[in-house]
């Protein structure tokens, strides 16, 4: 039987440098990845280095609210 909330949750990772550069309108968009995390192992916000196709480099992608 399920107890409480699900352990695995779906999260969205967003490029932090695209968000900062959005004011200058240098990038064509904002890179986002959809993945899952285990709430018991990682209770805090997740940050991963992923490739951003708009910045053309590996940047830090942080977890955002839905």
From Swiss-Prot:
Keywords: Chloroplast, Plastid, Ribonucleoprotein, Ribosomal protein
Primary subcellular site in the record, as a coarse category: plastid
Metal-binding is among the record's keywords: no
UniProt keyword Ribonucleoprotein present: yes
GO molecular function: structural constituent of ribosome
Any one GO biological process: translation
Compartments in which it is found: Plastid, Chloroplast
One Pfam family from the record: Ribosomal_L33
CC terms in the record's Gene Ontology section: chloroplast; ribonucleoprotein complex; ribosome
Recorded superkingdom: Eukaryota
HAMAP family assigned to the protein according to its UniProt record, in alphabetical order: Ribosomal_bL33
Annotated NCBIfam families: PRK00504.1, PRK00595.1, rpmG_bact
Protein family: Belongs to the bacterial ribosomal protein bL33 family.
Protein name in the entry: Large ribosomal subunit protein bL33c
Taxonomic source organism: Capsella bursa-pastoris (Shepherd's purse)
